[in-house]
């Protein structure tokens, strides 16, 4: 449930910022020590019967007269975010996992001893109450508290004023605080969960079986990326954190599971940027007797449904621009995309490898680098596309017909030499998905692996290894198959209007804290 951005939903002002935080912590530790002396400082016998958001929704139109005539008994707990002490009566705004609700606490109802203790409780404390719903004179739904308890003492003060965590890195580093004080952050991760649940549901509806494949690989494969390396002590062997599950999922296709998918983590020992995190979530799926055209239709439908399920609409706003996922996605070849956004390039120039190498140098591309060892015309066109068109693909666009030399696992085109039946989906200038008709010719796959090994020997750290067991699996025969990977984190960025991938990962990787 999305939390309202109301005044009461704002994080509370903690102790005055002029007071030293260490002094506040010391004072709270003294309070905790006193609680320990009294017996049970962290009681664990309270069981809520209601949550704040459900009460707000169910009784939003209920008048005070109705609540008096048919009392609603509730037991609710949460973190105290606001506190107003006024003599014999006080108010506290309490936040649970769903939202916020106000407690009305009077000395006559809870007793003099409990009320006196409450006045010394701090913002951030976890408290519980039993009582009845009522409306204040201002019409706010509240709990008339009859029983009040302190369940967990907060030792650290919440961020001051109404700004939450002002430092962006601190939001990532101390996500637990960010979640406490920011309803926007909580809504982002609820939307993430809704999107993933949507994907799972629609995959099941389409007859896919969810599976789990290894995270530790004896040979890294399934993508062009640099792996994290570890060591298995019991087996005394080097292992690699998986960069992609692809080759294991296709082994399952060989084994007879004709539709499989997996949502899990991949690990790539590469740079960190607003679009990249070394540990990230992907959904990969494979369907026998399909091809890349079927995959494009299916992927488009999946993403559209995920948007509707997570945000309620396929028409979104991303970074102050409209993003319409309801319309058919565009489909362009690499050269068509180049000429759409850089029309100065002629067909003849795009077919001239020498011209392209010279042109790429103007963009600062080192065409003598190891990854250009076997670079043909298609690779040079692809790099020019990345320099001129990729970032401008705001509307959902499938770029199709990738060159063989950069698509070692994709099926070659039957009609166009040097091209594979592969696509990448771009939205707002970011790659969201990558899919293709799978190469199921064991001998062709072995030849492509050998070429990848040549590139690795020449210094290309992202080139693939030769996976002999995968070749053996293909030799048993794999049916015609289509496979696709969708970047969950980047998809959630779109659905939540988040500019940085760290905004949609609960605990993103950061430099070590000094």
UniProtKB/Swiss-Prot annotation:
GO molecular function, one term: magnesium ion binding
Co-factor: note: Binds 3 Mg(2+) ions per subunit.
Any one Pfam family match given in the protein's UniProt record, by short name: tRNA_anti-codon
Main location: cytoplasm
Record carries keyword Ubl conjugation: no
Cofactor: Mg(2+)
Residue stretches in coiled coil: none
Domain of life: Bacteria
Keywords assigned by UniProt, alphabetized: Aminoacyl-tRNA synthetase, ATP-binding, Cytoplasm, Ligase, Magnesium, Metal-binding, Nucleotide-binding, Protein biosynthesis
Record GO biological process: lysyl-tRNA aminoacylation
NCBIfam families listed in its UniProt record: lysS_bact (TIGR00499), PRK00484.1 (NF001756)
Subunit details: Homodimer.
UniProt name for this protein: Lysine--tRNA ligase
């Amino acid at each position: 449930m999305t939390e309202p951005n109301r005044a009461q939903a704002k994080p509370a002002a903690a102790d005055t910022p002029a007071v030293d935080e260490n002094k506040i912590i010391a004072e709270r530790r003294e309070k905790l020590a006193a609680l320990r002396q009294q017996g049970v400082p962290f009681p664990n016998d309270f069981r809520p019967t209601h949550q704040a958001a459900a009460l707000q929704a169910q009784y939003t139109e209920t008048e005070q007269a109705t609540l008096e005539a048919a009392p609603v008994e509730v037991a609710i707990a949460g973190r105290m975010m606001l506190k107003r002490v006024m003599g014999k009566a006080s108010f506290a705004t309490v936040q649970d996992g769903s939202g916020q609700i106000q407690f009305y606490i009077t000395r006559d109802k809870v007793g003099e001893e409990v009320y006196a203790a409450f006045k010394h409780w701090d913002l951030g404390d976890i408290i519980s109450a039993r009582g009845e719903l009522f409306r204040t004179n201002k019409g706010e739904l509240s709990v008339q508290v009859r029983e009040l308890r302190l369940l967990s003492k907060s030792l650290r003060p919440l961020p001051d004023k109404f700004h939450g965590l002002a430092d962006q890195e601190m939001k990532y580093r101390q996500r637990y605080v960010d979640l406490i004080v920011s309803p926007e952050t909580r809504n982002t991760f609820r939307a993430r969960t809704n999107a993933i649940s949507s994907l799972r549901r629609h995959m099941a509806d389409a007859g896919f079986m969810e599976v789990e494949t290894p995270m530790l690989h004896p040979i890294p494969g399934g993508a062009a990326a640099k792996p994290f390396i570890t060591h298995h002590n019991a087996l005394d062997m080097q292992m690699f954190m998986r960069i992609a599950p692809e080759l294991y999922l296709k082994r399952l296709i060989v084994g007879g599971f004709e539709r499989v998918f997996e949502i899990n983590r991949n690990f790539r020992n590469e740079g960190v940027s607003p679009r990249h995190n070394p540990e990230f979530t992907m959904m990969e799926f494979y369907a026998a007797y399909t091809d890349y055209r079927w995959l494009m239709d299916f992927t488009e439908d999946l993403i559209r449904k995920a948007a509707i399920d997570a945000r309620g609409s396929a028409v979104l706003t991303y970074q102050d621009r409209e993003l319409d996922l309801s319309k058919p996605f565009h489909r362009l070849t690499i050269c068509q995309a180049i000429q759409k956004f850089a029309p100065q390039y002629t067909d003849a120039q795009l077919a001239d490898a020498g011209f392209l190498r010279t042109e790429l140098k103007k963009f600062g591309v080192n065409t003598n680098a190891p990854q250009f060892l076997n670079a043909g015309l298609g690779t040079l066109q692809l790099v020019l596309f990345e320099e001129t068109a990729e970032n401008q693909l705001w509307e959902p666009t499938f770029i199709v017909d990738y060159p063989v030399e950069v698509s070692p696992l994709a099926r070659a085109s039957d009609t166009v030499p040097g091209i594979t039946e592969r696509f990448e989906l771009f939205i707002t200038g970011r790659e969201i998905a990558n899919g293709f008709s799978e190469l199921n010719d064991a001998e062709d796959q072995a030849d492509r692996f050998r070429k990848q090994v040549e590139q690795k020997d020449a210094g290309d750290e992202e080139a693939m290894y030769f996976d002999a067991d995968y070749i053996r699996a293909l030799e048993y025969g794999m049916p015609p198959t289509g496979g696709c990977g969708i970047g969950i984190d980047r998809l959630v960025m779109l659905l939540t209007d988040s500019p940085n991938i760290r905004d949609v990962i609960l605990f993103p990787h950061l430099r070590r804290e000094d």
